[in-house]
């Protein structure tokens, strides 16, 4: 056995990782299960050689792949160059005859395509011959492509021609052709073909316009004469209302209203002439604007001539004439469908109204209960009026801002053919889900985090001294009597890696965290004094660690003491289920012998912690919003609520909105374990925080929210739920309600914690209780120890829902207060058979006495008075029964019980009284409750003892 080595020792000597050594050893067929397994020297050499050989093989393989890649790169590049030859000065640099033949075939194909296109050009261009020349052989490939693109663009223009292009082509046709170079001949020869066709159509339009003008002038002249004879006062009676509706144009003030009919006829002619081509569209606003202005000027001149022929003065008559035209134009606009705008264009009546853009309906829609019509219309891209109309046809009258129920929303969506999907509302106040789910974490951003280590052990076994040596500070000297007075969290750095330590007095925080489902500890260091051995709190620490499921590292301390015996400590620990790795390689614990006082083997202990942490592969994502657990909390008179937090995921920053347990706030200050202020804290970092609205409890979770509004809403919601749960919470198991709980099937075993004055009494009591036989029920001894009932016993009983039996011992003052707060049942006895009889009687449901609640009075709060240093006094009026000083009271607000407690004081006017009768006024204070408001109801009751039926 002396020549054997453990895997972790080989890793230290060679610098290789434990994982590689274990994997290589297993591949070689050696019996190796973990880094703690032992191998012979010969096997160790084979394992090291195997790891190095594997590494060299991988390196050689990579080198071969790199060489092969370098050989393949030139061939690939060469093939790409052959497929796409480079061109210099318009000539393709190609030497391969196959590629030359391919280029030749492409040029011949282009020639054939141009030859096929020539007959089309002859049909369109009847006046000019074809000028295009075939592509020469010496012409480069790029030039041929450019020529082909130009020809395609010109042919595309032949199909769609705008009226603006028609006017331009008329001017181009009249001019002489300029002298062009050979490069531009092809593009110029294509244009006249299209221009000749368009010019013919433009000439036809001009002839039609010229033919229509004389009739129009004659009609205008007769119309003006008739209007002047009627003195401009009679409405137009010529029966051409349609002409009015189309001819009323306020741009042309001197134009008669009856001209609209002829104008409409001309528009029809335009449409008929333009309909010869299916693809061309004529736009009157573009081509006839200038001509219309010329015609208007001629009309004005003709009106002046008419005035002279009538032998009347020009001034007044022109005014009347203009007024008549304006009046007729206004009348025509009344009949026009397009509206009566002042600058309405008469040609716009033929333009169709712009239709609303059509939006396709979504396949499905995720809706919320309470959505209104406007929200649904916006989601499915429809008008609210359309949805309101549908609902009206279904028999439901709503407006667009009215909230709809679930059935109505689904009915509307199904009517449109949209699948309704109810939105699952996420409970943002439930921060506990963040500790169970990890879907919000980014796997690519996960980094290694420091291990969180809890130091546990018996009193005065050297826990704080050990942590003091780790931190290289003098924490122990500052504590009263050398005993830890508070829970601390500290961080140290060793071998380039950080370790976070939790120092716990009596392990309350550890048990409290486990009771609330929090798991913050990764590793437990169990400190045992080599001279004292295993003590009661040592066994308690072992039970806590196993219940939490964290690995244990045993540190046998005080080797410098004369009576130190590490072998005896190891033997005693094995009796409680803690075995060394040498004895149990799979489930064993690491044992390290140290002396914290003389700094002996502390480096080995830290290396062991890092080794266990490496095996666990602890990782966290620092990029998300921070979550973590409360280690300690207290109320400071100057700073307010102060909480010691441990960040588990993400990064916590100053001014972050945060929810801690049932309270909320904004991070005001953050202090690290050295008392220095910091601006951010990453994973596994302990910090002390201020800025909370109330003091949280140890073990509560915290989470950072996106803004303060969301944090406030979540905190208030959590506080409301906690208060509701507290009211509805069933009573803890005690001897009074044990039988009822057993009948309801809520308990299959009775958990008991035994504390006695001597070890023999504790063992005898445990054996006697386990012999009690009740059908379907068994007694489970959670913990048995010697000494007074402490706070740690109360915490353990609260976590395991156990009953504490004290035999010849009493609870401490703090333990008694905590038991009342945690509602833990404590039974104190000095005779064993009475303990057995009481437990057996409780299990059979025959425990006396039994109490019944009796309501004796009811009162309503009329006024409240806040007295400094005293509290809130409620002035009340008794409406039924009476209020007595020795009774209990429930505070009811809006039908909900918000507090249940005793009456602290009772007064009638200024006198202290024992009771206040019906229809009388008085004042009272409720014990430990000051949130009394006007109109609250006091329900006064007493617990009356009754005899239990046997």
Swiss-Prot record:
It holds the Pfam family IF2_N. Its main location: cytoplasm. Residues 128-156, 165-186, 200-234, 291-312 have a biased composition (Basic and acidic residues). Residues 457-464 are annotated as: G1. Residues 595-597 are annotated as: G5. GO terms for cellular component: cytosol. Residues 557-560 are annotated as: G4. Residues 322-336, 343-352 have a biased composition (Polar residues). GTP binds at residues 457-464, 503-507, 557-560. Residues 128-352 are annotated as: Disordered. It is found in: Cytoplasm. GO terms for molecular function: GTP binding; GTPase activity; translation initiation factor activity. Residues 482-486 are annotated as: G2. HAMAP family: IF_2_B (MF_00100_B). One of the essential components for the initiation of protein synthesis. Protects formylmethionyl-tRNA from spontaneous hydrolysis and promotes its binding to the 30S ribosomal subunits. Also involved in the hydrolysis of GTP during the formation of the 70S ribosomal complex. This is Translation initiation factor IF-2. It comes from Lactococcus lactis subsp. cremoris (Streptococcus cremoris).
